[in-house]
A protein has these predicted regions:
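N-terminal cap/leader regions of alpha/beta-hydrolase-fold enzymes
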Residues: 1-243
Length: 243
């Protein structure tokens, strides 16, 4: 497998990213991996490698680059660390991530290992909002977007991602935990209602008995069967839309 740490120039600075793809010349269909709130780490790089082994070029950006190098030792997580994670999460928003996505698309367009044209993406936790937003902002590029236990997809703010779904041309996949304090009870019905007014092909699943984070193998709430089902669902969508 080919893998490398790269730097993508954005409107706001230099954004480090990890990339992985199969050995060989390619080109390979691209997947953007938007991180969860605790940030870029080896656990996510291993997940990016899994995507690459399936025949994709995966790019995992460090979305906290504006803050410098931010790393969290999650096994030693404390209340103070959680507060810093929340502050880091709040340092970015839909517009900033849209800017970063534009930069990544340009970077990939200039990379010979990346297949030109349609792009897939996945976002965990805080990035559920972002995969929805970028699918609307780049409707002719983002053709297959997945969200796992995504938060802030439906809010009362004017930039709430669910208000943009009528602009999406690609396919959407949302996997929610049954128990998730970050997803109030109105979110899934409101998201379903917004999508029902469009022609967007979408799948919304709620995985019984799961908690937020159920697809992260290093979390206490990891659920193998549900996690593997999300992988199967995502690969089926990406293969259908990108290969």
């Amino acid at each position: 497998m080919y893998e490398q740490h790269v730097v993508v120039t954005t409107k706001h600075g230099q954004m480090p990213a990890f990339v992985a793809c199969p050995d060989g010349a390619g080109p390979f269909p691209p997947i953007i991996f938007y991180m969860d709130a605790p940030g870029a780490r080896e656990e996510l790089r291993n997940m990016a490698r899994r995507i690459a082994r399936h025949g994709y070029f995966c790019i995992l950006p460090d979305m906290y680059y504006r803050l410098g190098t931010v790393l969290f030792d999650l096994p030693r997580r404390t209340d103070a660390m959680s507060a810093v994670i929340r502050a880091s999460m709040n340092s970015i928003n839909n517009e900033l991530v849209t800017d970063d996505t534009s930069a990544m698309l340009g970077w990939m367009d200039a990379n010979d290992r990346v297949k030109p044209g349609p792009v897939g993406c996945v976002g965990y936790c805080m990035s559920g909002q972002y995969i929805t937003t970028v699918s609307a902002r780049f409707p002719h590029r983002m053709v297959a977007a997945a969200s796992l236990y995504g938060v802030l997809i439906v809010t009362d703010q004017p930039d709430s991602p669910h208000l943009l779904v009528d602009k999406i041309k690609g396919e959407l996949y949302y996997a929610f935990a049954e128990h998730d304090a970050g997803v109030p009870g109105h979110v899934i019905p409101d998201l379903r209602a917004a999508l029902a007014k469009t022609d967007v092909k979408n799948t919304i699943k709620i995985f019984p008995g799961t908690q937020h984070g159920f697809a992260f193998a290093e979390r206490a709430d990891y659920e193998t069967v549900s996690a593997e089902q999300t992988w199967a669902d995502m690969f089926a969508m990406w293969d259908r839309c990108l290969k």
